[in-house]
Amino acid sequence: MNKLKQFIIQIILLFCTSFAAEASGPLGIDHRLTRADTGIWSRNNQLFLEYSSVVLVLGESLWLGSDTRLGKTFWKSTDSMIITAVGSAATKEAFRRERPSQGNDPNTWFKSSTDRSFPSGEVAHITAIITPFIAEYKNDNPFVWSLAVLPIYDGIGRMKSQGHWQTDVLAGAALGAGIGLYNSSRDTPFSVAILPNTITIGFNKRF
């Protein structure tokens, strides 16, 4: 839990320092961080988090099936991940915001179709994945809140690699959390309702 506290303190300090004189953007907090994407913050680690989370969520959904509490939560997480990916891509295309690495102006919007800074798709992705688990198990096991470390880590990493502005990260987290909470409230996950029972029943039941 000490590491969790350190991460939370770090992101709070990071956003507090955003209120510098040079900060701008829609909330007045955006500024480009000095590039420092090495070590724990390396781009490879960020991509590993993204890709491994996809494999884990899809794999566990297919293995456990939807008949158990945990299995159903994984399917809700799968739905959240897919819907968030579509929503994030559409939002990026609509707003076309320039990344910090492309220029030092957080107010550059609607410029080029290659500008896709807003919102942070990776932060939205990992937030959408963890939200159903927090919503489902928060009362049974408060330690599930430690999953919040993942989007916090990813958000800091994306800003340190100059891939996103502060408001990109906040918007991504809000998008992922919103979609995750919506899917958490559903009794039957979308995927389970659409896919054949032979897929959603769980491969572990076949062995």
Language-model region placement:
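Hydrophobic alpha-helical bundle signature of multipass membrane enzymes
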Residues: E22-S117, V123-M159
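Bacterial N-terminal signal peptides that target proteins for export
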Residues: M1-I9, N44-F48
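Alpha-helical membrane-inserting segments
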Residues: T17, G87, T91, F95, ...
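Outer-membrane beta-barrel architecture
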Residues: A128, P132, G178, G202-N204
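Outer-membrane beta-barrel proteins
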Residues: L62-G65, Y137, L181-F190, K205-F207
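Interfacial helix-loop-helix junctions of multi-pass membrane proteins
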Residues: R97-D105, Y153-S184
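Bacterial N-terminal signal peptides
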Residues: I9-S18
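Outer-membrane beta-barrel "beta-signal"
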Residues: P196-F207
